Regions:
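Ubiquitin-like/PB1-type beta-grasp interaction modules and other compact soluble beta-rich domains
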Residues: 1-154
């Protein structure tokens, strides 16, 4: 299954989980491209689909409408002095730099966050792929990146 999630923003799942077909020799950016466009989203990235792919933002008019960062996450962000700045939140895209300096998109496969770029992963039948928005380097989605603690899994 495949999902795109923004629960750290109080927005729940933007997509899915949905069943997705995976094709031989197709890397994850191509799957992401198909799913996002199918559900009416566009996106920005750096690198290329085949090398150094980094998902910078997912875009659609009103994507952040009604967002509300859970109070527990705000408290943790205040503790690390990365206070959410509403001026950095666009109504039309969600990505790196939204609200905090540590925000961006991460992905996990079968419950494990991947340390390599999406372009290096070839999805297989049965995979559970989650593309998730984090406000602080993954700490709010259950990933202790760069030696940081994890705050829970929103």
């Amino acid at each position: 299954t495949f999902s795109v999630e923004a629960s750290t923003m109080g927005l729940g799942n933007l997509i899915g989980p949905v069943n997705v077909s995976y094709y031989d020799e197709e890397t994850l950016p191509y799957v992401l491209n198909r799913v996002l466009y199918q559900y009416g989203y566009t996106y920005h990235y750096s690198g290329s689909m085949d090398s150094g792919f980094y998902l910078k933002s997912i875009d659609r008019a009103g994507i952040t409408d009604g967002y509300h960062v859970p109070d527990a996450i705000v408290s943790h962000l205040e503790d690390v002095n990365d206070i959410p700045d509403p001026d950095t939140c666009s109504a039309d895209w969600l990505g790196e730099g939204t609200l905090t300096g540590g925000s961006g998109w991460m992905y996990s496969v079968n419950g494990t966050y991947m340390s390599s770029g999406m372009n290096t992963y070839f999805p297989a039948d049965g995979d559970v792929i989650r593309v998730r928005f984090t406000l602080y380097y993954g700490a709010d989605i259950g990933e202790a990146m760069q030696g940081r603690e994890t705050w829970g899994d929103w």
